[in-house]
Amino acid sequence: MFVDQITLELRAGKGGNGVVAWRKEKYLPKGGPYGGNGGNGGSILIEAVTNMYSFEEYRNLSFLKADDGQAGASNNRTGRNGKDLVLKVPEGTLLRDAATGELIHDFTKDGERIVVCQGGRGGKGNVFFKTSTNRAPTKATPGKPGEIRLVELELKLIADIGLVGFPNAGKSTLFNTLARTEVKVGAYPFTTLHPSLGLVHQEGMLYQKPWIMADIPGIIEGASQNRGLGLDFLRHIERTRLLLFVIDISGIERHSPEQDLKILMGELLAYKEELKDKDMVIALNKIDQLLPDEREERVALLKQQFPDQEFILLSGLTGEGVDALYDLFKSKLSE
């Protein structure tokens, strides 16, 4: 299950209590205080990792707790510190305070780690309170409670390429062709119900770093007002380096390619106007279903209405035009 939003209560460990104890040895009848300090409670940290793409493993949890510190002991022994709890999250995770909505941290890199809840300090044993005027203190202090925090985790996928388009535009078929995977494909809206990630290797380039591609669920008119799958997945578009609009040029589904592209761009800009500054390419898909003359006519009309856009013709089903798309990725995404 793809889980990209979750609320959790995080509870750091309590510090162990300090103890009152006395040194008891045969030749030291007045051995003095000998009670040790309590150990510190475990803290809760959050760390971003690669190869994790959802919060699925936390979906049935309401809270997470680090270990408490152990109490001190006689012989001036300090209690064991509680073990820290490290919460692993995907790159692209936003951490917010659930009570205030304040952004605590934006995790964008593998290995990025912060302390979210500090463990409580251990209490002091009676050895700590020994002074020149108080040689036999009977005081010890309890451990401090650990911090408790209610947090929200929200994922914005980080990918090189984001596939966006209307339901049934052929995104999933194209995704399968490019990533050599098997995302579910079907002839009904919203076949893709959650973002899918794949690695794109060009033929003969298997030893170079692949591109990460995200297949974003189908967008419909009104998505920016949360219709359809709406805002749940539009946010995953924000962090992609290249937006690949997949448009059904065949007209078989009674779509107008020009109208589809106009609505699609309008929805993205209504969601966040800054998306207009992203690198975009328009993939005119399903060309295998058109005669050459029909292709030329429809492409000419699109270029006339969208003169500033870059178009590429292809078929996710037959693979026609895919090599040219690989070359385009290479030119756009090379560092």
Curated annotation (Swiss-Prot):
Its cofactor is Mg(2+). Mg(2+) binds at residues 172, 192. It is found in: Cytoplasm. It holds the Pfam family GTP1_OBG. GO terms for cellular component: cytoplasm. Gene3D superfamilies: GTP1/OBG domain, P-loop containing nucleotide triphosphate hydrolases. Its EC number is 3.6.5.-. Residues 1-158 form the Obg domain. Its main location: cytoplasm. It comes from the Bacteria. GO terms for molecular function: GTP binding; GTPase activity; magnesium ion binding. One of its GO terms (biological process) is ribosome biogenesis. Residues 159-334 form the OBG-type G domain. GTP binds at residues 165-172, 190-194, 215-218, 285-288, 315-317. InterPro entries: G_OBG, GTP-bd, GTP-bd_Obg/CgtA, GTP1_OBG_dom, GTP1_OBG_dom_sf, OBG_GTPase, P-loop_NTPase, Small_GTP-bd. Keywords: Cytoplasm, GTP-binding, Hydrolase, Magnesium, Metal-binding, Nucleotide-binding. Monomer. Belongs to the TRAFAC class OBG-HflX-like GTPase superfamily. OBG GTPase family. An essential GTPase which binds GTP, GDP and possibly (p)ppGpp with moderate affinity, with high nucleotide exchange rates and a fairly low GTP hydrolysis rate. Plays a role in control of the cell cycle, stress response, ribosome biogenesis and in those bacteria that undergo differentiation, in morphogenesis control. This is GTPase Obg. It comes from Chlamydia trachomatis serovar A (strain ATCC VR-571B / DSM 19440 / HAR-13). The gene is obg.
